[in-house]
């Protein structure tokens, strides 16, 4: 599922994509997929990209700072930036992009020749991801937070669990 979140400076319990018209919105610049899926969501909602003042060249950290400074109205952002903005009162969750449903975020590309030459390697890769996902769906957010906590030394387990839970 899409891990990006749209946060705004004001509470917006009845968010609709059309409400972004006329707003200055910072989008994720570090990787292309969140911007592509947001464009698709907007198109499906009948919203023209030209009606929104986009900030496309800043990092998520820079967009978080810009939201805090009142320089932009909304951000498309990942954790832990989203949680930090919500916890300090600057950001309000407008939309969790995960509601769009399953999407292909972990993808592996190879040639037909490699697949034919190394079928067991390909199968092992897919089976490994399947096993990892099964564990993630079985464990509680706190268990998952504890398992991956060493990768996020600046976050305590409770905060990380809150982010994992969404």
Predicted regions and their residues:
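Secondary-structure end/capping motifs
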Residues: 116-166
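N-terminal secretory/targeting leader peptides
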Residues: 89-92, 153
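Short polybasic/polar patches that bind polyanions
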Residues: 43, 86, 150
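Active-site-proximal catalytic alpha-helix in oxidoreductases
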Residues: 103-110, 126-130
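A bilobed periplasmic-binding-protein/Venus flytrap-type ligand-binding module shared by bacterial periplasmic
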Residues: 3-14, 105-121
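Short, glycine-/small- and polar/acidic-enriched structural segments
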Residues: 1-66, 73-79, 92-96, 102
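Solvent-exposed, polar/charged alpha-helical surfaces in well-ordered, non-transmembrane soluble domains
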Residues: 18, 36-40, 65, 69, ...
């Amino acid at each position: 599922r899409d891990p990006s979140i749209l946060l705004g400076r004001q509470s917006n319990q009845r968010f609709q994509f059309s409400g972004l018209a006329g707003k200055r919105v910072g989008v994720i610049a570090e990787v292309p997929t969140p911007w592509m899926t947001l464009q698709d969501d907007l198109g499906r909602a009948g919203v023209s990209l030209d009606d929104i003042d986009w900030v496309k060249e800043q990092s998520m950290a820079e967009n978080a700072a810009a939201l805090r400074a009142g320089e932009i109205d909304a951000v498309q952002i990942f954790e832990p930036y989203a949680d930090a903005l919500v916890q300090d009162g600057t950001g309000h969750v407008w939309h969790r992009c995960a509601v769009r449903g399953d999407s292909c975020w972990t993808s592996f590309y190879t040639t037909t020749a490699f697949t034919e030459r190394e079928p067991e390697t390909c199968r092992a890769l897919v089976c490994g991801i399947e096993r990892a996902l099964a564990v993630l769906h079985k464990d509680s957010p706190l268990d998952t937070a504890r398992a991956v906590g060493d990768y996020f030394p600046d976050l305590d387990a409770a905060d990380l669990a809150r982010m994992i839970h969404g």
